[in-house]
Amino acid sequence: MIDLTPQPGDLDPIETAPVEELRALQLERLQWSVRHAYDNVAHYRRAFDEAGVGPDDIGSLADLARLPFTSKATLRDNYPFGMFAVPREDVVRLHASSGTTGKPTVVGYTRDDLDMWADVVARSIRAAGGRRGMVLHNAYGYGLFTGGLGAHAGAERLGCTVVPVSGGMTQRQVQLILDFEPDVIMVTPSYMLSIVDELEAQGVDPRSTSLKVGIFGAEPWTNDMRREMEERTDMHAVDIYGLSEVIGPGVASECVETKDGLHVWEDHFYPEVIDPVTGEVLPDGEEGELVFTTLTKQAMPVIRYRTRDLTRLLPGTARTMRRMEKITGRTDDMIILRGVNLVPTQIEEIVLGIPTLSPHFQCHLDRSGNLDTLTVRVERRDATTDEEAAAAQAELGRRIKASIGVSVGVDVVDVASIERSVGKMRRIVDHRAAR
């Protein structure tokens, strides 16, 4: 793979500033953001007053822990514009979640918010190996989902030539990759696998394309998936993180030179990790639920937003800013099976350790009597024989039991048996409510 290590002068000065300078900037911006939220959002004023804490009580970064949390339910309870801190006419764009489990969560942006967002996405693409003048194939979905437009604006801000393909039409994705010869692709990791499969189906070696960097986000993926992707495509596979409630993509990104955790852009987003049960702030290095406070957002500041993503904070490496470990799962994706907690990424690591199995899998939850059951459905690879598939099925069952301590069902199925997604992959299928 090509060396894309940044050169001196490529980075924003704050990325390598002394930690004391960064912390001073964070405190100044935190105090502004808390005051802005308190003065302009009725929910925050009421919540802070009930907690007995006000903007004047925030004298240090540690004081942030005195403030109450914000959740997705908070945003839905104030649907559609109740969390906005500026007049609606100052909001130049709206995005929203799909709302498949209730009211959508609506987020708004001022012109300055959009400029900041473009800056942090540009910083993320550059960290991942993107450079001015490169062609970037954007296969994130456009529309109310923040991925497509967020990636697009950041790539243009960096100076890339953007191909705004959006998601879907996999054969067309492949044709445009072959015709336009992009250097970078931004897409969900599960859909990248579909693109790679389609390249191979057309007789094209995925290692022979022009792609140098894949920036994958919107769903958790493991280092085993990275190895799979890099071996099959000969491009750097780099993680990007974001969520619409905070800004969209560009909250954090891995850097291509280390690929060992995502640098949080702490000059705009202050991270905490908490115990998901007690809400206690955990020290750096301990795994828990990720919480973010925006430091510069105007239209919709969020204070201590509970992401439900599980990770831990680590010291900076190539940059001053702390890293977050790759997301291991979500508190709401956690499967509790006979008292044992597991997340789909644990299954992914085991699946990818068996060469005759593909990365395409789903976890099916069901109930037999009063007992919850789990069946892992996973596709065999193209060249896998029936005998190898049977052996892989037995081996996967053994490895899962050895790893998590309980037995699960395993069903190795034919290629293309599991639904493909152009967005976030549906890893858990819960049949229990139908019983």
Task: Describe the role of every protein-language-model region.
Residues 221-316:
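Conserved AMP-binding/adenylate-forming
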Residues 158, 180, 210, 232-236, ...:
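Short, structured coil segments at secondary-structure junctions
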Residues 135, 202-221:
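Conserved helix-loop-beta element of the AMP-binding
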Residues 111-124, 135-194:
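AMP-binding/adenylate-forming
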Residues 1-96, 101-119, 123-127, 131, ...:
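Nucleotide 5′-phosphate-binding alpha/beta core
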Residues 192-210, 227-231:
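Adenylate-forming
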Residues 185, 291, 295-404, 423:
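AMP-binding/adenylate-forming catalytic core of the ANL superfamily
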Residues 37, 97-100, 136, 185, ...:
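Conserved S/T- and glycine-rich ATP-binding loop of Class I adenylate-forming
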